[in-house]
Design a protein with these regions (language model features):
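Basic/polar, cationic surfaces and motifs that engage anionic cell-wall
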Residues: 1-23, 57-61, 66, 80, ...
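Secreted/periplasmic proteins that engage bacterial cell-wall peptidoglycan
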Residues: 14-68, 163
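A short, structured beta-strand/loop element
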Residues: 69-72, 77-79
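Conserved PDZ fold ligand-binding element
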Residues: 166
Length: 166
């Protein structure tokens, strides 16, 4: 699994003190990039992209908001959760295997890293239909894969710093 660091510029963010759950979302857009989401959320007056990760349709995973920062993805649940957004509109579309596989790998990695047992969809915590009725929750969240490897990092300033801190 490879996680690409986006190096997005954020405004001031609070540090999250605990990680108890993962909340899954869809972008409600058939096509979008990390930069699109960041711009949309800045235009909402937020610090930047509210999700911690974006999984693209081709299976590429992007790190958006730093993992240790409070998200802006699920009102009332941001202080103890990580948010993962999946490119697509799963009210209408059917997720393809590349995106399912990448999402499953990311969820399993984060569950192992943080000792998380709780994975939810946005509509479990807020009055919304996100991530849509076609979202393959069981295929992504309820996998019992073990031995998930640490993700490789694309070379870059943040990846280099993270590697040196590990």
């Amino acid at each position: 699994m490879n996680i690409i660091n986006t190096n997005l510029n954020f405004k001031q963010m609070d540090t999250r003190s605990s990680t108890q759950r993962i909340i899954l979302h869809h972008a409600a857009a058939k096509k979008c990039s990390a930069e699109d989401i960041h711009r949309w959320h800045l235009n909402n007056g937020w610090s930047g992209a509210g999700y911690h990760f974006l999984v693209r349709k081709d299976g590429t995973i992007y790190r958006l908001r730093p993992e240790d920062k409070v998200g802006a993805h699920a009102y009332g649940a941001n202080y103890d959760s990580l948010g993962i957004c999946f490119e697509g509109d799963y009210k209408e579309e059917i997720m393809q295997e590349e995106e399912i596989k990448a999402g499953r790998e990311l969820v399993n990695f984060l569950k192992n890293k943080y000792g998380i047992n709780t994975v939810q969809v946005h509509k479990n915590v807020n009055a919304t239909n996100c991530p849509g009725d076609n979202f393959p929750f069981d295929q992504i969240a309820n996998s019992n894969e073990t031995g998930v490897s640490k993700p490789s990092q694309e070379k870059g300033k943040i990846a280099t710093i993270q590697t040196s801190l590990n």
